């Protein structure tokens, strides 16, 4: 679907950097469905929404919104609806450089984090193109790449060791995020122990509970893994159990990461000052570049670590995540969760992302620096 205003357009290719007309003239939303190469359970496809912004100067910015209905309440249909009915009318006719003005308009509507984030990043893509600079440089320009971590899903210990070994030998990845939260918790303890025994000190391991355990279960599980040198423990308990998570932080020496419980700057303040977390997961898929930057600077001011997270991002979403993560010293200190796109059997970019020697480089081209393959987009798009 498309929301647009009439305008006369000039070619962006003939404009001097910084002189293109950045007035937003059109916002397009295209839902699409891509198959997962390693599907399990009830999840066999990734259902995202491509968000495309056009300007009077002929520039086109893109980003993707990956809905997580059981976490944020968004679906493909809701993302398309809120952008076309509320957000697009609010930004049409506005200069893409007026980021605070646009942000204030989007903020009037509660929720809808990935819809807001995708629109925000598409606008940043336009701005980078207009000035002929990569978004990474506009944001901070600290590095041109990030180390990559890989998520290991639920399986038996041998299978997860094999998967980790494949990732290390094929892509050079040596940091692994292990999904935990099963009952009995010994199932996950056995997996983490098998990984540590197989790799020794050659890899970094941390765990993510996806809110699956009670505080007491989480404490017992972490006690059972105390000798495995886990570097982080992410969202082991329900996101709304503030007191339970606060209790857990006091009972473990492993730094506790807030993810789903800290999705806005206000929630980050609550989690850190209230003692419910020691570190914060930043996901550009839900906070875009604008709010991700706010959260990062909050954490820097409070002396709190950050990790770049992932939301089943495709290659377009991953390009956005690495663009932000590479821009700052604080976000490059830990490996970023930038490998989920490997679970997808196909994607939308004309030049696929490449993980080499355990790192993912940013594109050196202006904006986010990627191009959507229109044939693939047409193949995977769906009608709602």
Region annotations inferred by a language model:
Residues 2-3, 14-72, 343-346:
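Structured beta-strand/loop patches that form or line metal/cofactor-binding pockets in enzymes
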Residues 21, 26, 54-130:
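Metal- or metallocofactor-binding catalytic centers and their adjacent structured scaffolds
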Residues 51, 58, 87, 119, ...:
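Conserved, mostly hydrophobic/aromatic
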Residues 137-252:
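Metal-dependent enolase-superfamily TIM-barrel catalytic cores that perform enediolate-based chemistry
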Residues 343-384:
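C-terminal extensions of enzymes
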């Amino acid at each position: 679907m498309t929301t647009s205003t009439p305008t006369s357009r000039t070619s962006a290719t003939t404009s001097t950097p910084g002189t293109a007309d950045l007035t937003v003239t059109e916002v397009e939303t295209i839902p699409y469905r891509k198959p997962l190469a390693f599907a399990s359970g009830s999840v066999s496809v990734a259902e995202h929404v491509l968000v495309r912004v056009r300007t009077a100067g002929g520039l086109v910015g893109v980003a993707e919104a990956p809905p997580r209905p059981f976490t944020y309440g968004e679906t493909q249909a809701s993302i398309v609806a809120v952008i076309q009915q509320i957000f697009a009318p609010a930004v049409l006719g506005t200069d893409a450089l007026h980021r605070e003005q646009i942000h204030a308009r989007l903020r009037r509507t509660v929720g809808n984090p990935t819809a807001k984030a995708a629109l925000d990043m598409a606008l940043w893509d336009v701005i980078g193109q207009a000035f002929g600079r990569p978004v990474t440089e506009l944001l901070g320009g600290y590095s041109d790449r990030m180390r990559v971590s890989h998520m290991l899903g639920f399986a038996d210990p041998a299978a997860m060791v094999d998967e980790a070994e494949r990732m290390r030998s094929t892509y050079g990845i040596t940091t692994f995020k292990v999904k935990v939260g099963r009952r009995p918790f010994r199932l996950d303890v056995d997996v983490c122990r098998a990984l540590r025994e197989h790799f020794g000190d050659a890899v970094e391991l941390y765990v993510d509970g996806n809110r699956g355990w009670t505080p007491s279960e989480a404490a017992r599980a972490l006690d059972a893994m105390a000798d495995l040198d886990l570097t982080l423990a992410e969202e082991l308990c329900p996101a709304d159990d503030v007191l339970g998570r606060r209790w857990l932080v006091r009972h473990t020496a492993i730094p506790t990461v807030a993810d789903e419980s800290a999705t806005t700057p206000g929630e980050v303040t609550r989690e850190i000052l209230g003692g419910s977390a020691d570190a914060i997961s930043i996901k550009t898929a839900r906070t875009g570049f604008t709010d991700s930057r706010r959260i990062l600077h909050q954490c820097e001011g409070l002396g709190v670590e950050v990790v770049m997270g992932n939301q089943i991002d495709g290659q377009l979403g991953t390009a956005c995540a690495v663009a932000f993560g590479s821009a700052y010293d604080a976000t490059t200190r830990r490996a970023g969760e930038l490998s989920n796109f490997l679970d997808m059997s196909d994607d939308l970019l004309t030049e696929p992302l490449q993980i080499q020697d355990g790192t993912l480089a940013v594109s050196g081209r202006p904006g986010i620096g990627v191009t959507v393959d229109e044939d693939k987009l047409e193949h995977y798009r769906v009608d709602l």
